[in-house]
Amino acid sequence: MSVTLQTVLYSLQEEQARLKMRLQELQQLKRERTGSPGAKIPFSVPEVPLVFQGQTKQGRQVPKFVVSNLKVCCPLPEGSALVTFEDPKVVDRLLQQKEHRVNLEDCRLRVQVQPLELPVVTNIQVSSQPDNHRVLVSGFPAGLRLSEEELLDKLEIFFGKAKNGGGDVETREMLQGTVMLGFADEEVAQHLCQIGQFRVPLDRQQVLLRVSPYVSGEIQKAEIKFQQAPHSVLVTNIPDVMDAQELHDILEIHFQKPTRGGGEVEALTVVPSGQQGLAIFTSESS
């Protein structure tokens, strides 16, 4: 009876070891398939430097989107002025009194002060897909003494040669820090991406460049809301009674006086009658 139990126990131990080995094999196979470039896009991804400029706090909701280098264009009507203050509290004080009287030598100007509402994208959905005929070339060092046209010419010549793995270049475009190249044969683009890195002669030196897939995107949905500019107000209803420079100085003096509810003016732009203006706002962190 004891021998039988030992035999059964030994058989169970062997079966357990065999199953454990099989499990390890399956886990290794899963890791290989998951880590394989072919599981997603069969090419290398361009190396893009990222810099964290935000805050980390526990218990806070993670943002669903990030907007980089935000620029908002705001049209300015004729007979108006855009006034920007260093302290946003000045804006709050001025908006409590919509009509302001600006003293001139012989009369007073009655102008309207109103908040500046800016359209801001709060959510955006973009569909993206690889372009099989195009590649993205990156890794250009700073200080290259080549014009944009010279750089594009040299890249077209290099990647247009079959000995370099290239082919007929149909399109080329300079992007921000990168170059897009489009080829007539999609197999050429795929082959270049599979190689990934090339030493290209540029500006009397061999530069190691990276080639990765070009992904095109299309905006499917965008949500926009209007947000008040915290540091600026729009002054309207300005009559055509003097030249723009003189009016600029008078308005700056008026809105710098604390007795008028004003404060330190950071910038002031006047749009005379018969003209149109365009103000471009950027994020404070950019």
UniProtKB/Swiss-Prot annotation:
GO BP: innate immune response; macrophage activation involved in immune response; negative regulation of cell population proliferation; negative regulation of non-canonical NF-kappaB signal transduction; positive regulation of inflammatory response; positive regulation of innate immune response; positive regulation of non-canonical NF-kappaB signal transduction; positive regulation of toll-like receptor 4 signaling pathway
Region Leucine-zipper, residue ranges: 5-26
Domain NID: 81-170, 183-266
Record bears the keyword Secreted: yes
Domain notes: The NID domain 1 is involved in the negative regulation of p65/RELA transcription and the negative regulation of NF-kappa-B pathway activation.
Protein family per UniProt: Belongs to the NMI family.
Name of this protein: Interferon-induced 35 kDa protein homolog
